[in-house]
Regions:
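Radical SAM enzyme [4Fe-4S]-AdoMet core and its adjacent flexible, acidic
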Residues: 1, 57, 123-126, 130-132, ...
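Cys/His-rich metal-chelating microdomains
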Residues: 39, 43, 47-50, 278, ...
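Conserved catalytic core of Hanks-type protein kinase domains
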Residues: 39, 130, 318
Protein backbone atom coordinates (compact mmCIF):
# COMPACT_ATOMS: atom_id res chain seq x y z
CA UNK A 1 0.00 0.00 0.00
CA UNK A 2 1.46 3.33 -1.08
CA UNK A 3 1.44 5.94 1.67
CA UNK A 4 3.03 9.29 2.44
CA UNK A 5 5.16 8.42 5.45
CA UNK A 6 4.72 10.72 8.43
CA UNK A 7 8.47 11.26 8.89
CA UNK A 8 8.61 13.04 5.50
CA UNK A 9 5.84 15.49 6.30
CA UNK A 10 7.95 18.14 8.02
CA UNK A 11 10.13 18.47 4.94
CA UNK A 12 7.03 18.61 2.76
CA UNK A 13 5.57 21.41 4.87
CA UNK A 14 8.83 23.37 4.73
CA UNK A 15 8.71 23.28 0.95
CA UNK A 16 5.37 25.07 0.80
CA UNK A 17 6.41 27.64 3.38
CA UNK A 18 4.23 29.76 5.65
CA UNK A 19 1.34 29.91 3.16
CA UNK A 20 0.18 26.42 4.13
CA UNK A 21 0.24 27.30 7.82
CA UNK A 22 -1.53 30.61 7.31
CA UNK A 23 -4.30 29.18 5.16
CA UNK A 24 -4.74 25.84 6.87
CA UNK A 25 -4.29 26.51 10.56
CA UNK A 26 -6.73 24.63 12.74
CA UNK A 27 -8.28 27.32 14.92
CA UNK A 28 -11.18 25.29 16.33
CA UNK A 29 -11.52 21.71 17.49
CA UNK A 30 -15.14 20.83 18.33
CA UNK A 31 -14.29 17.16 18.99
CA UNK A 32 -11.23 15.78 20.80
CA UNK A 33 -10.66 12.08 21.39
CA UNK A 34 -8.47 11.06 24.32
CA UNK A 35 -6.99 7.58 24.56
CA UNK A 36 -7.13 7.25 28.33
CA UNK A 37 -5.08 4.07 28.08
CA UNK A 38 -3.44 1.79 25.58
CA UNK A 39 -4.35 -1.20 27.76
CA UNK A 40 -7.38 -3.38 27.07
CA UNK A 41 -9.09 -6.25 28.85
CA UNK A 42 -10.63 -7.67 25.67
CA UNK A 43 -8.74 -10.03 23.36
CA UNK A 44 -10.31 -9.08 20.04
CA UNK A 45 -9.26 -10.78 16.83
CA UNK A 46 -9.64 -7.40 15.08
CA UNK A 47 -7.25 -5.44 17.30
CA UNK A 48 -3.76 -5.74 18.82
CA UNK A 49 -3.83 -3.07 21.54
CA UNK A 50 -4.33 -5.77 24.17
CA UNK A 51 -1.08 -7.45 23.11
CA UNK A 52 1.28 -4.52 23.74
CA UNK A 53 -0.57 -1.57 25.31
CA UNK A 54 1.00 -0.27 28.53
CA UNK A 55 0.57 3.48 28.93
CA UNK A 56 -2.17 5.50 30.62
CA UNK A 57 -3.04 9.20 30.31
CA UNK A 58 -3.13 10.69 33.80
CA UNK A 59 -5.30 13.39 35.32
CA UNK A 60 -2.46 15.92 35.24
CA UNK A 61 -2.06 15.49 31.48
CA UNK A 62 -5.77 16.12 30.92
CA UNK A 63 -5.65 19.15 33.22
CA UNK A 64 -2.87 20.62 31.06
CA UNK A 65 -5.12 20.25 28.01
CA UNK A 66 -7.91 22.43 29.42
CA UNK A 67 -6.51 25.81 28.27
CA UNK A 68 -6.07 24.39 24.77
CA UNK A 69 -9.63 23.07 24.75
CA UNK A 70 -10.84 26.55 25.71
CA UNK A 71 -8.69 28.23 23.04
CA UNK A 72 -9.83 25.77 20.35
CA UNK A 73 -13.49 25.98 21.39
CA UNK A 74 -13.68 22.25 22.05
CA UNK A 75 -17.20 21.15 22.90
CA UNK A 76 -17.07 17.37 23.11
CA UNK A 77 -14.42 14.95 24.40
CA UNK A 78 -14.60 11.27 23.54
CA UNK A 79 -12.83 9.00 26.03
CA UNK A 80 -11.51 5.93 24.26
CA UNK A 81 -8.52 3.61 24.26
CA UNK A 82 -7.72 0.71 24.77
CA UNK A 83 -10.42 0.33 27.35
CA UNK A 84 -10.82 3.73 29.05
CA UNK A 85 -12.41 2.30 32.20
CA UNK A 86 -9.09 0.56 32.95
CA UNK A 87 -7.55 3.96 33.65
CA UNK A 88 -7.69 4.30 37.47
CA UNK A 89 -8.45 8.02 37.12
CA UNK A 90 -11.24 7.75 34.52
CA UNK A 91 -13.91 9.13 36.85
CA UNK A 92 -11.78 12.09 37.97
CA UNK A 93 -10.92 12.85 34.34
CA UNK A 94 -14.56 12.75 33.25
CA UNK A 95 -15.58 14.90 36.22
CA UNK A 96 -12.84 17.44 35.43
CA UNK A 97 -13.91 17.73 31.80
CA UNK A 98 -17.57 18.04 32.70
CA UNK A 99 -16.84 20.65 35.35
CA UNK A 100 -15.08 22.71 32.68
CA UNK A 101 -18.15 22.82 30.46
CA UNK A 102 -17.27 19.98 28.10
CA UNK A 103 -19.60 17.21 27.04
CA UNK A 104 -18.05 13.82 27.72
CA UNK A 105 -18.65 10.70 25.66
CA UNK A 106 -17.45 7.20 26.60
CA UNK A 107 -16.51 4.50 24.08
CA UNK A 108 -16.17 1.20 25.94
CA UNK A 109 -16.17 -2.56 25.56
CA UNK A 110 -18.73 -2.60 28.36
CA UNK A 111 -16.88 -5.19 30.44
CA UNK A 112 -16.86 -2.94 33.52
CA UNK A 113 -20.02 -0.98 32.76
CA UNK A 114 -22.28 -2.91 35.13
CA UNK A 115 -19.87 -2.21 37.99
CA UNK A 116 -19.68 1.52 37.21
CA UNK A 117 -23.12 2.12 35.69
CA UNK A 118 -24.38 4.63 38.26
CA UNK A 119 -21.20 6.72 38.23
CA UNK A 120 -20.96 6.54 34.44
CA UNK A 121 -24.54 7.76 34.07
CA UNK A 122 -23.70 10.73 36.31
CA UNK A 123 -20.49 11.68 34.51
CA UNK A 124 -21.06 11.01 30.82
CA UNK A 125 -23.41 12.64 28.36
CA UNK A 126 -23.32 9.59 26.06
CA UNK A 127 -21.99 6.03 26.12
CA UNK A 128 -21.21 3.80 23.16
CA UNK A 129 -20.66 0.09 23.80
CA UNK A 130 -18.92 -2.17 21.28
CA UNK A 131 -20.87 -5.42 20.96
CA UNK A 132 -19.91 -7.86 18.21
CA UNK A 133 -22.14 -10.85 18.87
CA UNK A 134 -25.77 -11.59 19.68
CA UNK A 135 -24.94 -14.77 21.58
CA UNK A 136 -22.13 -15.92 23.88
CA UNK A 137 -20.48 -18.14 21.26
CA UNK A 138 -20.13 -15.43 18.62
CA UNK A 139 -19.06 -12.82 21.15
CA UNK A 140 -16.35 -15.10 22.55
CA UNK A 141 -15.06 -16.02 19.10
CA UNK A 142 -14.58 -12.34 18.19
CA UNK A 143 -13.75 -10.75 21.53
CA UNK A 144 -11.67 -13.56 23.00
CA UNK A 145 -13.57 -13.54 26.30
CA UNK A 146 -16.66 -15.29 27.62
CA UNK A 147 -18.28 -12.00 28.63
CA UNK A 148 -21.42 -11.60 26.51
CA UNK A 149 -23.79 -11.70 29.49
CA UNK A 150 -21.60 -9.29 31.46
CA UNK A 151 -21.67 -6.71 28.66
CA UNK A 152 -25.43 -7.06 28.22
CA UNK A 153 -25.88 -6.57 31.96
CA UNK A 154 -23.80 -3.40 31.74
CA UNK A 155 -25.91 -1.98 28.92
CA UNK A 156 -29.09 -2.68 30.87
CA UNK A 157 -27.59 -1.14 34.01
CA UNK A 158 -26.60 2.08 32.24
CA UNK A 159 -30.09 2.34 30.73
CA UNK A 160 -31.66 1.73 34.14
CA UNK A 161 -29.57 4.60 35.53
CA UNK A 162 -30.93 6.99 32.93
CA UNK A 163 -28.26 6.86 30.22
CA UNK A 164 -29.14 4.23 27.61
CA UNK A 165 -26.00 3.50 25.57
CA UNK A 166 -25.72 3.23 21.84
CA UNK A 167 -24.38 -0.08 20.54
CA UNK A 168 -21.66 -0.19 17.90
CA UNK A 169 -21.31 -3.43 15.90
CA UNK A 170 -18.29 -4.28 13.75
CA UNK A 171 -19.65 -6.53 11.01
CA UNK A 172 -17.39 -9.34 9.83
CA UNK A 173 -17.60 -12.89 8.59
CA UNK A 174 -18.30 -14.32 12.05
CA UNK A 175 -21.35 -12.16 12.77
CA UNK A 176 -22.81 -10.61 9.58
CA UNK A 177 -25.69 -13.12 9.52
CA UNK A 178 -26.81 -11.72 12.89
CA UNK A 179 -27.46 -8.25 11.43
CA UNK A 180 -31.24 -8.22 12.09
CA UNK A 181 -30.77 -9.89 15.47
CA UNK A 182 -28.46 -7.08 16.59
CA UNK A 183 -31.33 -4.62 16.08
CA UNK A 184 -33.69 -6.76 18.14
CA UNK A 185 -31.08 -7.28 20.86
CA UNK A 186 -30.33 -3.56 21.09
CA UNK A 187 -34.01 -2.85 21.67
CA UNK A 188 -34.30 -5.64 24.24
CA UNK A 189 -31.31 -4.27 26.18
CA UNK A 190 -32.76 -0.76 26.29
CA UNK A 191 -30.13 0.77 24.02
CA UNK A 192 -30.63 4.24 22.57
CA UNK A 193 -29.40 3.26 19.11
CA UNK A 194 -27.51 0.60 17.16
CA UNK A 195 -24.85 1.36 14.58
CA UNK A 196 -22.86 -0.79 12.15
CA UNK A 197 -19.51 -0.55 10.42
CA UNK A 198 -17.34 -3.00 8.49
CA UNK A 199 -14.30 -4.62 10.05
CA UNK A 200 -11.20 -2.77 8.86
CA UNK A 201 -9.01 -5.29 7.06
CA UNK A 202 -7.60 -2.94 4.40
CA UNK A 203 -5.40 -0.90 6.76
CA UNK A 204 -2.72 -3.21 8.23
CA UNK A 205 -1.77 -0.65 10.88
CA UNK A 206 -5.22 0.12 12.31
CA UNK A 207 -5.99 -0.78 15.93
CA UNK A 208 -2.35 -1.20 16.93
CA UNK A 209 -1.65 -3.95 14.41
CA UNK A 210 1.82 -4.84 13.23
CA UNK A 211 3.17 -5.33 9.72
CA UNK A 212 2.57 -9.08 9.81
CA UNK A 213 -1.20 -8.69 10.25
CA UNK A 214 -3.07 -11.42 8.34
CA UNK A 215 -6.85 -11.48 8.28
CA UNK A 216 -9.65 -13.91 7.56
CA UNK A 217 -12.20 -11.53 9.06
CA UNK A 218 -13.75 -10.17 5.87
CA UNK A 219 -16.67 -11.74 4.05
CA UNK A 220 -15.80 -14.31 1.40
CA UNK A 221 -17.25 -14.40 -2.10
CA UNK A 222 -19.93 -16.88 -1.10
CA UNK A 223 -21.05 -14.55 1.72
CA UNK A 224 -21.87 -11.55 -0.46
CA UNK A 225 -25.24 -12.77 -1.74
CA UNK A 226 -26.52 -13.83 1.72
CA UNK A 227 -25.44 -10.46 3.10
CA UNK A 228 -27.29 -8.65 0.32
CA UNK A 229 -30.39 -10.71 1.10
CA UNK A 230 -30.13 -9.69 4.75
CA UNK A 231 -29.86 -6.03 3.77
CA UNK A 232 -32.97 -6.33 1.63
CA UNK A 233 -34.80 -7.96 4.52
CA UNK A 234 -33.78 -5.44 7.17
CA UNK A 235 -34.85 -2.55 4.95
CA UNK A 236 -38.35 -4.04 4.77
CA UNK A 237 -38.69 -5.31 8.32
CA UNK A 238 -37.13 -2.34 10.14
CA UNK A 239 -38.42 0.65 8.21
CA UNK A 240 -39.50 2.42 11.37
CA UNK A 241 -36.10 1.82 13.01
CA UNK A 242 -34.40 3.52 10.06
CA UNK A 243 -36.91 6.36 10.08
CA UNK A 244 -36.57 6.98 13.81
CA UNK A 245 -32.78 6.75 13.82
CA UNK A 246 -32.74 3.72 16.11
CA UNK A 247 -30.60 2.20 13.35
CA UNK A 248 -28.04 4.98 12.96
CA UNK A 249 -27.17 4.34 9.33
CA UNK A 250 -29.50 4.79 6.40
CA UNK A 251 -30.22 1.74 4.21
CA UNK A 252 -27.96 3.29 1.58
CA UNK A 253 -25.08 3.60 4.02
CA UNK A 254 -25.48 -0.01 5.18
CA UNK A 255 -25.10 -1.06 1.56
CA UNK A 256 -21.71 0.62 1.51
CA UNK A 257 -20.58 -2.16 3.85
CA UNK A 258 -21.51 -4.72 1.20
CA UNK A 259 -19.63 -2.66 -1.39
CA UNK A 260 -16.58 -2.54 0.90
CA UNK A 261 -16.45 -6.31 1.32
CA UNK A 262 -16.92 -6.78 -2.43
CA UNK A 263 -14.00 -4.42 -3.06
CA UNK A 264 -11.80 -6.44 -0.70
CA UNK A 265 -12.48 -9.37 -3.04
CA UNK A 266 -11.64 -7.25 -6.13
CA UNK A 267 -15.29 -7.22 -7.17
CA UNK A 268 -15.67 -3.52 -7.69
CA UNK A 269 -14.42 -0.25 -6.28
CA UNK A 270 -14.41 0.76 -2.64
CA UNK A 271 -17.30 3.02 -1.71
CA UNK A 272 -16.32 6.68 -2.05
CA UNK A 273 -15.20 8.18 1.25
CA UNK A 274 -16.38 11.64 2.28
CA UNK A 275 -14.44 12.75 5.32
CA UNK A 276 -13.17 15.98 6.83
CA UNK A 277 -12.57 14.65 10.36
CA UNK A 278 -9.09 16.25 10.64
CA UNK A 279 -10.69 19.66 10.07
CA UNK A 280 -12.82 19.48 13.23
CA UNK A 281 -11.35 16.73 15.41
CA UNK A 282 -8.13 15.13 16.60
CA UNK A 283 -7.03 12.06 18.53
CA UNK A 284 -4.60 12.37 21.44
CA UNK A 285 -2.84 9.16 22.44
CA UNK A 286 -2.07 8.09 25.98
CA UNK A 287 1.56 9.22 25.57
CA UNK A 288 0.61 12.61 24.11
CA UNK A 289 1.08 11.94 20.39
CA UNK A 290 -1.57 13.81 18.37
CA UNK A 291 -3.17 12.15 15.35
CA UNK A 292 -5.53 13.58 12.71
CA UNK A 293 -7.90 10.62 13.14
CA UNK A 294 -8.08 7.10 14.55
CA UNK A 295 -6.31 5.46 11.63
CA UNK A 296 -3.42 7.72 10.57
CA UNK A 297 -0.45 8.27 12.93
CA UNK A 298 0.63 11.79 13.71
CA UNK A 299 4.03 13.21 12.75
CA UNK A 300 6.88 13.40 15.28
CA UNK A 301 6.35 17.12 15.95
CA UNK A 302 2.70 16.57 16.96
CA UNK A 303 3.51 15.71 20.56
CA UNK A 304 2.15 17.38 23.67
CA UNK A 305 3.84 15.29 26.37
CA UNK A 306 6.79 13.00 26.86
CA UNK A 307 10.57 13.02 26.60
CA UNK A 308 12.07 15.99 24.77
CA UNK A 309 8.84 18.00 24.66
CA UNK A 310 9.04 21.56 25.95
CA UNK A 311 6.77 22.30 28.93
CA UNK A 312 4.98 25.06 27.01
CA UNK A 313 3.98 22.69 24.20
CA UNK A 314 0.22 22.77 23.81
CA UNK A 315 -2.43 21.21 21.62
CA UNK A 316 -2.76 24.16 19.23
CA UNK A 317 0.98 24.10 18.57
CA UNK A 318 0.90 20.35 17.93
CA UNK A 319 -2.07 20.67 15.58
CA UNK A 320 -0.50 23.50 13.59
CA UNK A 321 3.12 22.37 13.40
CA UNK A 322 4.66 21.84 9.99
CA UNK A 323 4.23 18.07 10.06
CA UNK A 324 0.57 18.05 11.06
CA UNK A 325 -0.34 20.87 8.67
CA UNK A 326 1.25 18.92 5.82
CA UNK A 327 -0.47 15.72 6.90
CA UNK A 328 -3.88 17.41 6.91
CA UNK A 329 -3.06 18.80 3.48
CA UNK A 330 -2.22 15.33 2.20
CA UNK A 331 -5.48 13.96 3.58
CA UNK A 332 -7.42 16.85 2.08
CA UNK A 333 -5.78 16.22 -1.31
CA UNK A 334 -6.66 12.52 -1.26
CA UNK A 335 -3.00 11.49 -1.05
CA UNK A 336 -3.35 9.06 1.88
CA UNK A 337 -4.14 5.52 0.81
CA UNK A 338 -5.75 4.74 4.19
CA UNK A 339 -8.53 7.20 3.47
CA UNK A 340 -9.64 5.43 0.31
CA UNK A 341 -10.52 2.26 2.26
CA UNK A 342 -11.64 3.85 5.54
CA UNK A 343 -14.60 2.19 7.29
CA UNK A 344 -15.24 4.96 9.83
CA UNK A 345 -15.18 8.28 8.02
CA UNK A 346 -16.80 11.44 9.38
CA UNK A 347 -18.08 14.49 7.57
CA UNK A 348 -19.32 17.72 9.07
CA UNK A 349 -20.62 20.67 7.10
CA UNK A 350 -17.86 23.33 7.24
CA UNK A 351 -20.53 25.97 7.75
CA UNK A 352 -21.70 24.15 10.88
CA UNK A 353 -18.34 23.21 12.39
CA UNK A 354 -18.95 25.52 15.34
CA UNK A 355 -22.47 24.24 16.00
CA UNK A 356 -22.62 22.35 19.27
CA UNK A 357 -24.45 19.05 18.82
CA UNK A 358 -25.16 16.91 21.82
CA UNK A 359 -22.76 14.07 22.49
CA UNK A 360 -25.60 11.64 21.85
CA UNK A 361 -26.12 12.99 18.32
CA UNK A 362 -22.60 13.88 17.25
CA UNK A 363 -21.63 10.54 15.73
CA UNK A 364 -24.82 10.34 13.71
CA UNK A 365 -24.54 13.93 12.45
CA UNK A 366 -20.85 13.59 11.59
CA UNK A 367 -20.99 10.19 9.92
CA UNK A 368 -20.34 10.22 6.20
Amino acid sequence: MATIESHNLSAEASAVGPVLGALRRLERLPLATLYLTERCNSRCVTCDYWRHGRDDMDLAAVTRLLPSFAQLRTQLVLLSGGEPLLNPEWAQIAELLRRNGLQVWLLTSGLALAKHARRAAELFHAITVSLDGTDPETYTAIRGLDAFDKVCTGIRAAAANGLPPSIRVTLQRANFRQLPTFVDLARELGARQVSFLAVDVANPHAFGRTDDFVSDLALRAEDLRPFETLLNSIEQDHREDFRSGFIAESPQKLRRILQYFAAILKRGAYPPVRCNAPEFSAVIGATGRVQPCFFIPGPPDAQIAGAGVQPESDLSRALNGAGMAALRGAIRAGARAECKTCVCSMWRDPERIDAAPSAARFALEASA
